[in-house]
Regions:
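Immediate post-signal peptide segment of exported/extracytoplasmic ligand-binding proteins
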Residues: 23-38, 69-74, 97, 164-169
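Extracytoplasmic "Venus flytrap"
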Residues: 25-58, 67, 80-87, 176-181, ...
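Beta-alpha junction/loop-to-helix N-cap segments that form part of ligand/metal-binding clefts
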Residues: 21-22, 49-53, 68-142, 206, ...
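Periplasmic-binding protein-like
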Residues: 96-108, 128-130, 170-175, 222-232, ...
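Extracellular/periplasmic Venus flytrap/periplasmic-binding protein
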Residues: 91, 135-136, 143-246, 281-289
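Extracellular/periplasmic periplasmic-binding protein-like sensory domains
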Residues: 239-310, 371, 377-380
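C-terminal motif of bacterial Sec signal peptides marking the signal peptidase cleavage site
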Residues: 14-17
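Segments of small-molecule ligand-sensing domains
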Residues: 298-306, 317-370
Length: 380
C-alpha cells in the first residue's frame, strides 16, 4: 500500500488570504471550503502525465476561486496517487471517498480507473474520469461515473466519416495483433462495409509486423485509403514502406500513433498522413489562451491530461452550482444536464449510458513534421 503521508496531498486552489479581498475590496470573501478529489498516477512510469493532470485541476481550482469559488466557498483539492494498477487505483479512490469530497476527477490508466470507479461508485460519489478510455467504464454501468473520453466505437465512426469525406472507394484496414487494434479494425471494417465501400482487412503480429505482406495487401486491393490501427512505431515504418512501394493514396492511423515515435519512424513519409485522435491543446486554437495561462503558472506547456482535468473540475463545479448542494446524489443528477457548459471541444453532454454524446475525437494531419488540426468533426 502507498504511504499515506506521501500519497495524500491536500492542495488549495489558492490560499484563503489570496482568494478573499480585504474589507472594502471588490470581491466577496469566500466562507468555508469545498473539496474535490483528484486521482492520478504520481509514481511510476506515468508520473509525468499524472502530474500534468493534477496541474490542470489546480489551475481550474485557482480560477474558480478567483471567480468567487463554488457556492461562495473556497475550492480545495485532495490529491491521491492512484497508480496504474487496479489495487492502487482502488486504494487511492477509497482514501478520497473517506475524505467526503464533493466529487472526484482524474483517472488515467484504464485498469486503475476502472477499479477506482467501482470504489468511488460504492459510496455514490460523482466521478468524472478525465483521461482513461471510456469503454470498460461504460460497460460497468456505474451510476455516479462519467467518462470524459470517447469510446473505441466513436473513434471508428470518426475514421469512417473521414474516409467518406475524402471520397474513399477502396479501403484497406490494417491491424497489429493487440486486442485494442483488432477491435478498432473490426469496427471500422464493419462500418465501411455498411456504407457500401470495398474494404479489405488484414492483421499482423504486434511485435514484428510483416510490412512487406501489408504493402502487398494494399497493392493487390488497389486501395485509395489505408487505415492503420496498431502501434505508433510500426505505423510509421508502414507508411514509409507504402510510399517507397509507390502508394499515392490516403494514409490514416489511429490514436495509438499520436506519438513522436510515429513521426520518427516515418520520416518524410509522414507528411500529409491523417490521424484519428482525441483533441489536445496543441491541436485546438480555442485552447491557446488557456495554454498560455497554464505555462505562465507551471513554466511548461500543458498536455492533454491537464486540459481534460481542467475541464472535468469545472464541470464538477458547475454540477454543484446547479444542485446548490454538495450532496452526492444531487451532484450526480446534475452532471448529465449541465446548462450552457462547454469544454475546449464544445458542448459537454452525456448520453443515457454516460458516454459522451459529442465525443472529443478530431482529425489531425502531419504538416511540416508535426501534428496539426485538420478537422474538429463537430459542428456545435
Amino acid at each position: 500500500m502507498l504511504a499515506l503521508g506521501a500519497a495524500a496531498l491536500v492542495v488549495s486552489g489558492l490560499l484563503a488570504a489570496c482568494s478573499a479581498s480585504d474589507e472594502g475590496g471588490g470581491a466577496a470573501r469566500l466562507r468555508g471550503e469545498i473539496t474535490f478529489g483528484v486521482l492520478a498516477p504520481l509514481s511510476g512510469d506515468m508520473a509525468e502525465r499524472g502530474q500534468d493532470l493534477v496541474d490542470g485541476a489546480q489551475l481550474a481550482a485557482a480560477e474558480l476561486n478567483d471567480q468567487g469559488g463554488v457556492l461562495g466557498r473556497q475550492v480545495k483539492l485532495a490529491v491521491e496517487d492512484g497508480g496504474c494498477a487496479p489495487a492502487t487505483g482502488e486504494q487511492g479512490a477509497t482514501r478520497l471517498a473517506a475524505k467526503s469530497v464533493a466529487g472526484v476527477v482524474g483517472g488515467l490508466c484504464e485498469n486503475a480507473a476502472v477499479a477506482a470507479a467501482n470504489a468511488v461508485a460504492a459510496e455514490g460519489t460523482p466521478f468524472l474520469v478525465s483521461s482513461a478510455r471510456a469503454d470498460r467504464l461504460i460497460e460497468a454501468g456505474l451510476p455516479s461515473v462519467f467518462p470524459m473520453e470517447g469510446t473505441v466505437y466513436q473513434e471508428a465512426l470518426a475514421a469512417v466519416h473521414w474516409m467518406g469525406y475524402r471520397s474513399a472507394q477502396r479501403v484497406v484496414v490494417l491491424a497489429d495483433g493487440s486486442p485494442a487494434s483488432q477491435r478498432l479494425s473490426g469496427l471500422v471494417t464493419d462500418r465501411v462495409k455498411a456504407d457500401g465501400l470495398t474494404v479489405s482487412r488484414q492483421s499482423a503480429e504486434a511485435n514484428r509486423p510483416d510490412l512487406a505482406g501489408l504493402v502487398s495487401t494494399v497493392t493487390a486491393a488497389k486501395a485509395d485509403f489505408v487505415y492503420w490501427t496498431g502501434a505508433a512505431e510500426p505505423g510509421g515504418r508502414l507508411v514509409s514502406a507504402l510510399r517507397q512501394a509507390g502508394y499515392t493514396g490516403y494514409f490514416m492511423a489511429s490514436s495509438e500513433s499520436d506519438s513522436p515515435e510515429f513521426l520518427q519512424a516515418a520520416g518524410a513519409a509522414a507528411e500529409d498522413a491523417f490521424l484519428t485522435t482525441a483533441a489536445g491543446p496543441r491541436l485546438l486554437p480555442a485552447a491557446a489562451d488557456w495554454a498560455a495561462r497554464f505555462k505562465d503558472r507551471f513554466r511548461r506547456d500543458p498536455g492533454r491530461d491537464a486540459m481534460q482535468a481542467y475541464d472535468a473540475l469545472r464541470a464538477m463545479a458547475q454540477a454543484v452550482r446547479q444542485a446548490a448542494d454538495t450532496a452526492p446524489s444531487k451532484v450526480v443528477d446534475n452532471l448529465p444536464r449541465l446548462e450552457g457548459f462547454t469544454t475546449f471541444t464544445g458542448t459537454l453532454r452525456f448520453a443515457a449510458d454516460h458516454s459522451l454524446r459529442y465525443d472529443n475525437y478530431v482529425i489531425a494531419q502531419v504538416r511540416g513534421g508535426t501534428f496539426t488540426l485538420a478537422s474538429k468533426l463537430r459542428t456545435d
